[in-house]
């Protein structure tokens, strides 16, 4: 496959996995409320006085991302192991974003454009590019589309009382 060609099927599959993994914690919180809501950082604070990650990063959300991604993969005829790795990498990118934002002194659920979407999308797309048949252009397009989805859909989800913030 030429680097200049865009494989829209692979991009759509990857975008579906990204949306699935990243919406799973939000939807699960909406369904379960505070039940089974244990923070990944176990309330750990670092020497800067800020939490390692914060209350919004939970084991429930992490496992929900894996579960929703596997369901999505099965619907797309992808291997469940790819979906599992994808979700773990996406959530690792999300945790990295939260860690960086806490070190910047930003409160939980604060918005930092780019930092909120790039690590959680770049990490799985880049590390699983062969398994997902993505080239550099496909990865760039997918990240751009994911960013646009987040920017356009988040305010709507906020108005529908699904998200706590409009971003």
Question: PLM ranges: what are they?
Answer:
Residues 1-84, 91, 95-127, 133-167:
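Interhelical loop and helix-boundary elements at the membrane-water interface
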């Amino acid at each position: 496959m030429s680097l200049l060609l865009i494989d829209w099927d692979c991009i759509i599959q990857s975008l579906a996995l990204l949306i699935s993994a990243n919406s799973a914690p939000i939807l699960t919180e909406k369904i379960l409320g505070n039940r089974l809501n244990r923070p990944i950082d176990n309330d750990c604070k670092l020497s800067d006085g800020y939490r390692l990650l914060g209350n919004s990063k939970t084991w429930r959300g992490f496992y929900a991302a894996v579960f929703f991604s596997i369901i999505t993969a099965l619907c797309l005829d992808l291997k469940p192991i790819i979906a599992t790795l994808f979700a773990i990498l996406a959530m690792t990118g999300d945790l990295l974003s939260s860690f960086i934002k806490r070190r910047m002194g930003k409160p939980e659920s604060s918005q930092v454009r780019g930092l909120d979407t790039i690590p959680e999308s770049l990490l799985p797309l880049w590390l699983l590019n062969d398994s997902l048949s993505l080239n550099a252009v496909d990865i760039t397009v997918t990240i751009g589309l994911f960013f646009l989805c987040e920017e356009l859909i988040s305010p709507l989800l906020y108005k529908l009382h699904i998200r706590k913030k409009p971003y």
